[in-house]
Amino acid sequence: MTEETTGGQYCVKGLVQQVLVGLERGVTVVIDHTEHDGPVLVAATMTLEPQAGGDHELALPPQRIVEQVKIRTNGKAWTPGEIAEDVLPDLVKAVRADDGIPTRFRLVTDGALNCDTLLTFAARLKAMPVAEDPLLALDDRNSRAFRYGRWLSERGYFQALMHRAGAKDAGRFWRMLAGFEAEGLVHAAHLEARIDAVLAEVVDAHEDVVGKRHELVGRMAKLAAAGGSISAIALLGEAGLPAD
């Protein structure tokens, strides 16, 4: 007979997943130069459990990435309504005053996604400037633009999501949605494999890869407990790993 997973075990699993996601982002930015290069690498800063919202943040000179990491306990795919209620409230807290730095607000989950409508809407907002009155800028004539339990206009869909998320500031909510992305079916084993593949490029011996990953996970967990920030290069340096 299989024992049911307890709430405490889910809590630990969620913390481990959060740390692994943050670590994978950090080591990839520094060691894998396919996406980022030059001085960007030096300035990459990671923050776990930032006070402003999200589970972790990666700050780079050209952009900021805020991610909310969620494990799925019921086996069901994430719907727009569930994302609006369980994910977006924390992400909208991370919206800053318009400082000109593009920000990606991401859901990362081990569950499946069933939120194409939400992602399509987010892409539409991204292509539009934030209006002085966001609600008036959204179309309200086509009453069958988006399906959310029932058919809604573009404006109605925005208002429904905003209400579900408990958001009060339409401008802040728009900026968050315009940068929203979702990545599903991200499992711990996949993250560990990605981290190990990157670490294998800089460790002295291949058999040291897993040990170094465990060391980095421990350091990241301490960082999360303190809500602190560290440059990705400094984190690797503390573990005796070169970043170039």
Residues covered by each model-derived region:
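Acidic metal-coordinating catalytic centers involved in nucleic-acid phosphodiester chemistry
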Residues: 1-13, 69-244
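Catalytic centers of nucleases
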Residues: 11-12, 18-86
